[in-house]
Amino acid sequence: NHYRKKAYTRSLLLQKGVHTIGLLNWFMGGNPCRVFASGGLDYFGRKEDPEKRCRDCERARSCRYYVVPKSPAAKAADGCVWSRDIDLNDNSQLLIDYDNGSRAVYMECHFTPEYTREFTLFGDEGKLTAFYNNECDFLIRVTKPGGSVKELRPVPERGGHGGSDINLVRAFFQAIEDGK
């Protein structure tokens, strides 16, 4: 599985987080000009033989990370999350300064109880909280000064990554047409 080793995936920030960081940059309306980063391998790895697989693990019924290896691709990716050969960070934090004066904190943790993306944006006109999970459920909550709250539940578009793949292609072609 290429999400286990730096030799195949330099970091999960580059492999997975880049999509969320791109969205964060869009929210912030600027370009990062300074970044401080930290992270580590603090939960997974370091315990089991690198050859151990979910398909023949004696703890399969009790392991929350058990993968049912039904397809050939799944069988290739059913390596134990506790394997000693894992060397990628399982958590990372970024402090980002933007060229427009805004700042952001980005945290990525791969051992949370759920698989979600959550954003909280603060500004002088209120707070926006956004939640997205892997099933394409979206919730956006806007809280204004004084306490009024508005909730939005956008309907995801069809297609890869909740419709964003085709929207990226459209934006790319529009940028070409606009000479950007």
Model regions: which residues?
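Predominantly a Rossmann-like dinucleotide-binding segment in NAD(P)-dependent oxidoreductases
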Residues: 1-79, 94, 172
